[in-house]
Amino acid sequence: MSVFSLKIDIADNKFFNGETSPLFSQSQAKLARQFHQKIAGYRPTPLCALDDLANLFGVKKILVKDESKRFGLNAFKMLGGAYAIAQLLCEKYHLDIETLSFEHLKNAIGEKMTFATTTDGNHGRGVAWAAQQLGQNAVIYMPKGSAQERVDAILNLGAECIVTDMNYDDTVRLTMQHAHQHGWEVVQDTAWEGYTKIPTWIMQGYATLADEAVEQMREMGVTPTHVLLQAGVGAMAGGVLGYLVDVYSPQNLHSIIVEPDKADCIYRSGVKGDIVNVGGDMATIMAGLACGEPNPLGWEILRNCATQFISCQDSVAALGMRVLGNPYGNDPRIISGESGAVGLGVLAAVHYHPQRQSLMEKLALNKDAVVLVISTEGDTDVKHYREVVWEGKHAVAP
């Protein structure tokens, strides 16, 4: 077997206290999923068991939730955007989301509205999709360096898309400024003082994928011992972990939060025990994770309940893309993009590492481990996907 060393810095969470949040409980997840189930085309995304790979890596099971199959959008993010917009409109028009369908919501809107957000690609596409479904407008801002394919995907949903010359976090501030000037509704997946309601709804919407996964694991007769969750601002990681620890308890679930080393604000916050922002270009292939300022709502859950934080180089994500796209043995093939594949990439990087055994022990990975991984996106940038998987971009160095 080849042996090579990729950067995977691991920090134990010294500030873990196991305090869960009622905002991200099982009941909140059920409410969100009940709404999503009323949207035409809803079906749970696959939970793929990579049994041959699990055997190779020395664990009992590897389960990958494949979010490339979500509503034809190639990513999970619409779960948050659509749910938040629905909640916003229900509040505005005094409607009950528990009894309302997406179609009824569309008919209830008595005015033309514009929803604005900042995105690296997937969240903005989800907001644009929801706005289009409801007959409303969307203006989507993207940071510099955004792939044209991701821009086109948003434009194809009828939204306006503006690529700035700023990084993600500065683009969020610009979006807020423009929205205030024009009277738009901001649907952003990060929070700040005075802006928490919509990000909370977004995070609750993300819990639908976790609720599906728990149901699917129960049908398989397995209970997860580990979950690897990638983080940008930490909205998905916080929302999903908040739900999972309500189901399994924080003490019984070994949760690992993974980030690119060029945008590892959650990792650095985890080391300090308080929010640490990261500035600059944050140049990483994991575009969906290139965020330097943690969502305070997500951070609180991660600080309280995450077991460990990992900061890793881009080659870890690229390795995950190649492993998922070229399955071992009889395992199913999964097309996973840069931000989607990094969790599996960590498992692969550990397997090939010269200090494999000590890393396995550090992460409590053994023959009894049942590991849940979320592939949050498919090949949302096909050109770059092929450069990585076909042409060996960001290859490992032996």
Positions of predicted regions on the chain:
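PLP-dependent amino-acid enzyme catalytic core
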Residues: 1-398
